[in-house]
């Protein structure tokens, strides 16, 4: 058995160099499925440290196929695994925010621990998910949004896919994915299923010099800014860290209902997103999408604060820009400029 793995089993935490080493071994196929499963189980049981996450992220970024995107590009993504069965809120938020001026590099995958992953729902909506890096950059430059399909950029993840699936519970990879955007986005809105994990991720991300990042974790368990409860926020901006709580009323939104934002399939999620973009979905669904889109607009410097961002997002939905953006994203490049 790997010596570092043995030390983890015996209760010791890893320093950043050791964490980097063992993640590199995982990413290069040097560990067996049993060893990977053992490590992920130990970490899930005892909890990860910020230093371990920093080392893991550094190794994942080194193994990834990275690309350079436009300045101020924003990623909206979450850890998933909150078990709430909500529609793909961060995906809807990305479409709305990009229609209102933010440049979005949406990093995502098919579902691992939820009803529907961002790739699943975008595919249902008719948006191409497996574009080349060049096509993705062009889409962001011309349409303000591109999708970075995780397996295309993190091919080394194939070595851990089997173990993750077999374990069927949240692992450290739920935390690492949002910190490993292939476009090295320095601006992000990251939804996290618990504020404790958000604090860990924020401390780890500080090592990578972020420009403006919001970690959001709602008290009803969503890895989103919520319209059904207060949301705890950790904001990294200009080398400083701010912690605060935001409620729907703070940004001009009423409290909503969880059942109005829950779905059972990617198809149901897709249909609800279309209804939201048409401004005819349940108020709770429109509002939670706008709340999270507003956060992306704030991080993208398109809004002075969250409240202004939400107002701009609601305007984009009401004015039809968000629905038009979906149609643009569905078009092939040659159709768009024919």
Swiss-Prot record:
One GO cellular component term noted in the UniProt record for this chain: cytosol
Pfam families in UniProt: Glycos_trans_3N, Glycos_transf_3
Entry note: cofactor: Binds 2 magnesium ions per monomer.
GO MF: anthranilate phosphoribosyltransferase activity; magnesium ion binding
Positions of anthranilate 2 binding: 164
Enzyme Commission number(s) from the entry: 2.4.2.18
Tagged with keyword Transferase: yes
Chemical reaction(s) catalysed: N-(5-phospho-beta-D-ribosyl)anthranilate + diphosphate = 5-phospho-alpha-D-ribose 1-diphosphate + anthranilate
Xref: InterPro entries: Anthranilate_Pribosyl_Tfrase (IPR005940), Glycosyl_Trfase_fam3 (IPR000312), Glycosyl_Trfase_fam3_N_dom (IPR017459), Glycosyl_Trfase_fam3_N_dom_sf (IPR036320), Nuc_phospho_transferase (IPR035902)
Protein's pathway: Amino-acid biosynthesis; L-tryptophan biosynthesis; L-tryptophan from chorismate: step 2/5
Key words, A-Z: Amino-acid biosynthesis, Aromatic amino acid biosynthesis, Glycosyltransferase, Magnesium, Metal-binding, Transferase, Tryptophan biosynthesis
Binding site for Mg(2+) 2: 223-224
Amino acids binding anthranilate 1: 78, 109
PANTHER family named in the record: ANTHRANILATE PHOSPHORIBOSYLTRANSFERASE
Subunit text: Homodimer.
Record HAMAP family: TrpD
Protein's name in the database: Anthranilate phosphoribosyltransferase
Gene transcribed to yield this protein: trpD
